Amino acid sequence: MSVASLGSRLVPRADTALVAALRADLEAADLTVVAVEDLLGPVAAAALHREQPVAALRATAPDHAGTGPLPTLVRHLLLGAAVDRGALDRALPRLGTAGAERLGLVAAAGRGADDAVRPLIDLRPYAARDAAGAVGWWLASDLGETATGAALPADHVLGVG
């Protein structure tokens, strides 16, 4: 995807190579419902379902969870926390921060490894099981109140749940 402007809104456009790189990175990081709940633990996961992110932020802090791809992506994409460019580049080795910017997923403060990158969307895993078997996917939505600290606008795109 690339991003075009439509008035004050950013409008994503498909770029299949970048989307494929994102998918490969999310799969390699194991950004799944089960892995996220295992990383957070039952208390932080339950709190996050109640829109209380403090325990999840602590569980994904680099000094607690390390700097691997999964804690970085959970902290950034699910919790809406800014991370440094170097950490995001390591978490998304195929897509990189530059590719995530082109997809309209993030906004970087600069090009340096220590420059902050903030998420522009909420991207989280979902899973279901039916007669055909288990399936997992990721769903993008606008950042919620937990990430923005502000009331939702009228044109807010909700996530699921």
Language model regions located:
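Accessory substrate-recognition/RNA-binding modules or partner subunits associated with SAM-dependent
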Residues: 16, 23-117
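Non-catalytic substrate-recognition/targeting regions of SAM-dependent transferases
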Residues: 84-160
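S-adenosylmethionine-dependent methyltransferases
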Residues: 1-10, 14, 21-48, 53, ...
